[in-house]
């Protein structure tokens, strides 16, 4: 009886161990492929610290982290765009972009498309510059948390008056 339990436990360990190998996120395998392609496993890559990891560790609040993550995701999209025609890493790039879509954009295609549109604007294009400056005051107002709170208080105040009338 005891031996049967040990055998079943051993088989369970083997099954769970093998599932760990096969259930690994596809992006990990593809990221390893990109590491080989870019020689990112070489020791000199660690010189002068990390690009992104220290920055992410510095920010604990979710909203702050999202800001930093959006810049990092933007960087990766630009990096991948530079190598979109390289057939040797095409599958890896597409797999990782799809995983970013799921993790960062919650599979929301509209959110991803708008994000990519923002990252593709050229700051050297005079028409883009003119439009950006034209919209600057409204964008700054949207950035201000005080403006949002004031709007919310006014709308709650009006709702309260309507309910009491």
Curated annotation (Swiss-Prot):
The gene is IFNG. Glycans are attached at residues 48, 120. GO terms for molecular function: cytokine activity; type II interferon receptor binding. This is Interferon gamma. Homodimer. Interacts with IFNGR1 (via extracellular domain); this interaction promotes IFNGR1 dimerization. The modification Pyrrolidone carboxylic acid is found at residue 24. GO terms for cellular component: extracellular space. The keyword Signal applies. Its main location: secreted. GO terms for biological process: adaptive immune response; defense response to virus; humoral immune response.
